[in-house]
Amino acid sequence: MGILDGNPKDQPMHYGEITAIWAFMGANNGLISGYEAFVNHAEDTDLISLLEEAIKTMKAENKDFGKVLKANGITPPPALPERPKANAEDIPAGARFMDPEISGAISINVGQGLVSCSMAMGQCLREDVAAMFAKCHMEKVAFGAKLLSLNKSKGWIFPPPLHLQ
C-alpha cells in the first residue's frame, strides 16, 4: 500500500492542492466584497438577485474548502468585513457602476473561475478535493448560463461582428 491509498481524506495534500484551495478562497473573498459593493450600486432587481446568489454560493464554497484546510492544519485566508447596505440613489451618478458594467465584470469573473477550477481539478491527487473543484465548476457553469440569459434579455451583450451569410 502506498501513501495515496485508501480514503482520500486520510491522504496528505500536496502543495499544489493547498495553494489552489487557498488562492480560490482568497479570490472568493475579494469577489464577495466586490459583489456586496455591486449590490449597493445595482438597480436591476434580476441582477441584484444574481449577485446575492453568487455571494451565497461563494460563502458556501469557502466554508467547505476552509474545513479541508483546517483538517490539514492550514489556516484559511482571512475574509474581508461585510459591506454595509446602501441605496444606489445615494451614490453619485459619476461614481456609481451601471448595471451593464456590473454584469460585464461578473461575466469575466465567471470565466476566470471556470479556468481556475479546471486547473485545480487537473492538478489534484486527492479525489475529494478534485470533486469539490468539479462541484464549484458546475455551479459556475449553471450561474454563467443564467447570467448570459440575463445579459441577452437586458440588451447588455455587445457581440463582436456577426457573420450573417
Residue ranges and their predicted role:
Residues 115-162:
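A generic hydrophobic-segment detector
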Residues 13-21, 45-63, 102, 127-141:
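Alpha-helical scaffold segments that form or flank carboxylate-/histidine-based iron centers
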Residues 36-37, 59, 77, 81, ...:
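Generic alpha-helix signal with a bias toward terminal, lower-confidence helices
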Residues 45-81, 143-154:
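Conserved alpha-helical segments that form or flank metal/cofactor-binding pockets of metalloenzymes
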Residues 2-4, 67-104, 108, 163-165:
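Carboxylate-rich helix-loop segments that flank metal/cofactor sites and access channels
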Residues 1-25, 29, 42-45:
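Leu/Val/Ala/Ile-rich N-terminal alpha-helices, chiefly Sec-type signal peptides and the beginnings
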Residues 7, 28-29, 40, 62, ...:
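Detector for Asparagine
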Residues 17-40, 88-135:
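Acidic/histidine-rich alpha-helical segments that form the ligand environment
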